[in-house]
C-alpha cells in the first residue's frame, strides 16, 4: 500500500521516528522554557545536563545495579541537585544582567562538563539495555511499534502536560509566576523567593536529566549526545515562544513530525527544516508562535 507514492510502512516508520524525536524536543524545550520563562536565564548547559542524565543512569546500572525504573526516579534528583548548586553559586549573580552573560556562563559550563566526560569515557557510544517489560513490539496492522518507543511518547506527553498544568493552573504555579514578575511583593507574603527560584532551576534541570534517562535505551550514551541536540531544542523554543510552556510542548512534538515527514518527501532538507521554520517565524512573528511581544 502506498500513500502519495510512498510505501505506507516507510511513511509511518518516519512518523514514528518523528514522534520519538519530538518527545525529546518537547521534554528538553519544556525545561528550557521553564528556566527562561520563570528565571530569565538562557540555559545552554541543558544539553550537557541531558547527557548527565543518560550517564547517571548508565553508571547506576553498570556500577550499582540500578534498574531503569529506579534510575527514572533517582537521576532527575541527582542531576537536579547539581543544577541547584550551579544556580546558588553562579547563576544567581546574573539575574539582573543581560541575557548574554547567562548564555556565556552556561555555554562555558556545558563545554567543561562535556570535556570531562569525553576525557573519562571517550567519544564512542555505550549501550543501555531496553527494560525487559518493554522488549518487543505491538503489531498495529500497518507497522510494528516498539513497546519502549510507545512508552517514551506517552510518558513524555504526560510529563509535559502535567508540568504545564502545575505552572499554569495551580496556586504553586501562580506563586512562581508572581515571584518572577514581582519578587518583593511575593516575599512580603512570607514566601521564600530565592528558594523558589533555586528549586525551579533544579526542576528544569531534572527534566533534562529525565529526558536523558529515557533516551539512553534508544540512543547510545556518549558525552556528545546533547551537543547537537541542544541547538535544535533552542530552535524549538524560539519557534514556540521563549518562556511559553505550551509553545514548547506543541512545537516540540509538531516539529518532530515535520522533520520525520521531510525525511520521507525531501531527505536532503531534513537536517535544516527546523531552522528554516525558525527563520520564517522570526521574520513573521518574532515573539514565537505562542509567545507574546513584551
Language-model features, listed with the residues they occupy:
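Membrane-embedded helix boundary and interhelical linker motif in transport proteins
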Residues: 3, 38-85, 89
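Hydrophobic core segments of alpha-helical transmembrane domains in multi-pass membrane transport
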Residues: 54, 58, 76-82, 107-117, ...
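Transmembrane helix-bundle core of multi-pass membrane transporters
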Residues: 93-169, 196-199, 261, 268, ...
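Helix-loop-helix "hairpin" substructures at the membrane interface of multi-pass membrane proteins
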Residues: 21, 143-221, 245-251
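Cytosolic-side transmembrane-helix boundaries in multi-pass membrane proteins
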Residues: 10, 89, 120, 181-188, ...
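Membrane-interfacial amphipathic/re-entrant helices at transmembrane-helix boundaries
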Residues: 1-28, 56, 64-71, 98-101, ...
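Alpha-helical transmembrane segments within multi-pass membrane transporters and channels
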Residues: 65-109, 116, 250-251, 255, ...
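Transmembrane alpha-helical segments in multi-pass inner-membrane proteins
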Residues: 25, 65-77, 198-208, 212-213, ...
Amino acid at each position: 500500500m502506498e500513500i502519495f507514492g510512498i510505501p505506507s510502512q516507510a511513511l509511518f516508520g518516519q512518523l514514528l521516528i518523528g514522534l520519538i524525536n519530538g518527545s525529546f524536543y518537547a521534554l528538553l524545550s519544556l525545561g528550557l522554557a521553564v528556566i527562561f520563562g520563570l528565571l530569565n536565564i538562557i540555559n545552554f548547559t541543558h544539553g550537557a545536563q541531558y547527557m548527565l542524565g543518560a550517564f547517571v543512569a548508565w553508571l547506576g546500572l553498570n556500577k550499582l545495579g540500578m534498574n531503569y525504573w529506579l534510575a527514572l526516579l533517582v537521576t532527575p534528583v541527582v542531576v537536579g541537585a547539581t543544577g541547584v548548586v550551579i544556580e546558588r553559586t553562579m547563576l544567581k549573580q546574573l539575574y539582573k544582567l543581560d541575557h548574554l552573560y547567562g548564555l556565556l556562563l552556561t555555554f562555558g559550563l556545558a563545554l567543561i562538563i562535556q570535556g570531562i566526560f569525553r576525557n573519562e569515557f571517550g567519544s564512542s557510544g555505550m549501550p543501555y539495555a531496553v527494560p525487559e517489560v518493554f522488549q518487543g513490539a505491538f503489531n498495529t496492522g500497518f507497522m510494528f511499534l516498539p513497546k519502549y518507543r510507545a512508552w517514551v511518547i506517552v510518558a513524555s506527553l504526560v510529563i509535559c502536560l502535567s508540568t504545564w498544568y502545575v505552572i499554569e493552573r495551580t496556586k504553586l504555579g501562580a506563586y512562581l509566576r508572581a515571584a518572577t514578575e514581582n519578587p518583593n511583593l511575593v516575599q512580603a507574603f512570607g514566601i521564600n523567593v530565592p528558594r523558589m527560584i533555586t528549586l525551579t532551576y533544579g526542576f528544569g534541570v531534572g527534566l533534562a536529566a529525565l529526558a536523558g534517562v529515557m533516551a539512553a535505551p534508544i540512543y547510545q550514551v556518549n558525552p556528545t549526545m546533547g551537543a547537537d541536540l541542544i541547538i535544535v531544542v533552542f530552535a524549538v523554543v524560539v519557534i514556540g515562544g521563549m518562556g511559553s510552556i505550551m509553545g514548547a510542548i506543541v512545537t516540540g512534538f509538531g516539529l518532530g513530525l515535520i522533520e520525520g515527514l521531510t525525511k520521507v518527501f525531501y531527505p536532503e532538507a531534513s537536517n535544516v527544516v527546523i531552522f528554516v521554520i525558525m527563520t520564517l517565524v522570526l521574520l513573521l512573528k518574532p515573539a514565537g508562535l505562542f509567545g507574546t511581544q513584551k
